UniProtKB/Swiss-Prot annotation:
Entry keyword set: Amphibian defense peptide, Secreted
Biological-process GO terms, alphabetical: defense response
Keyword Secreted recorded: yes
Compartment annotation: Secreted
Role this protein plays: Putative defense peptide.
One annotated Gene Ontology cellular component of this protein: extracellular region
Source organism: Ascaphus truei (Coastal tailed frog)
Family: Belongs to the frog skin active peptide (FSAP) family. Tryptophillin subfamily.
Superkingdom as given in the UniProt entry: Eukaryota
Main location: secreted
Protein name: Tryptophyllin-4
Expression tissues: Expressed by the skin glands.
Keyword set includes Secreted: yes
Length: 9
């Protein structure tokens, strides 16, 4: 699945 910046915050 693609990762977005929201996954890292």
């Amino acid at each position: 699945e693609p990762r977005t910046p929201w996954d890292w915050v």
